[in-house]
Amino acid sequence: MGINLQEVSYTYQAGTPFEGRALFNVSLEIKDGSFTAFIGHTGSGKSTIMQLLNGLNTPTEGTVLVDDVAIRSDSKNKDIKNIRKKVGLVFQFPESQLFDETVLKDVAFGPQNFGISKEEAEKLAREKLAMVGISEELFEKNPFELSGGQMRRVAIAGILAMEPSILVLDEPTAGLDPKGRRELMTLFKELHQGGMTIVLVTHLMDDVSNYADWVYVLEKGRIVLSGSPKSVFQEIEFLESKQLGVPKITQFAAHLRERGITFDALPITLEEFVEAIKNG
């Protein structure tokens, strides 16, 4: 199951004095089984696209196709609800959405909301909590008694319990320490390897180079560049003009190139850099 945006535009608060255009005639494809990243400066339209992918918002113009189900400005709630089960959306700081009295109940709420029995929902909740690294001794605790990193994992388990085939992540590691960030990104990598389509919004270019297989660059509601991370991160000057960076190792290699060391293409991961130096 993939997602296609066909000439999609989105206007906030249309028809009011506060009207603002967030997307302009955007067309793109998120392929089934891909790990697609979106990068762009604040206000570029990344989060707006994320909210369109699972029907949280509907396009002002154009069509969002999810597994051949169309979301348009006049789409009915029934169609959108089915899409929200297929496309799980993890907001930035998702722990702010926790609400129930125990960890287990919180994670089981989503599946029950889609008509799954309490028994089956709790079974799913246990499975997904284990998947994100939450031990059974925490299942009956109030989620607000957990650490920030644990709360983040519980919130993500709640999305996974609805068994989406596409997982949309809006800055999922924001505010976490390096260890917590690595652990979460490893989880998303494992989900992707298991067949799940992953969509990632991030400002961390090293995460794009290490995990994504396709990247879209947005500016002021338009796609200005797209391609494999390898090809996109060769465009250092262009990205800098958009107030965006490149992976640390790519920047380092670019400095070496200025000093006379040649590369067939700038490496975007440490492994590529080591290989290039060995073969240099």
Curated annotation (Swiss-Prot):
Gene3D superfamilies: P-loop containing nucleotide triphosphate hydrolases (3.40.50.300). InterPro entries: AAA+_ATPase, ABC_transporter-like_ATP-bd, ABC_transporter-like_CS, ABC_transpr_CbiO/EcfA_su, ECF_ABC_transporter_ATP-bd, EcfA2, P-loop_NTPase. ATP binds at G40, H41, T42, G43, S44, G45, K46, S47. Keywords: ATP-binding, Cell membrane, Membrane, Nucleotide-binding, Translocase, Transport. CDD domains: ABC_cobalt_CbiO_domain1. Its EC number is 7.-.-.-. It is found in: Cell membrane. GO terms for cellular component: ATP-binding cassette (ABC) transporter complex. Belongs to the ABC transporter superfamily. Energy-coupling factor EcfA family. ATP-binding (A) component of a common energy-coupling factor (ECF) ABC-transporter complex. Unlike classic ABC transporters this ECF transporter provides the energy necessary to transport a number of different substrates. Forms a stable energy-coupling factor (ECF) transporter complex composed of 2 membrane-embedded substrate-binding proteins (S component), 2 ATP-binding proteins (A component) and 2 transmembrane proteins (T component). This is Energy-coupling factor transporter ATP-binding protein EcfA2. It comes from Streptococcus mutans serotype c (strain ATCC 700610 / UA159).
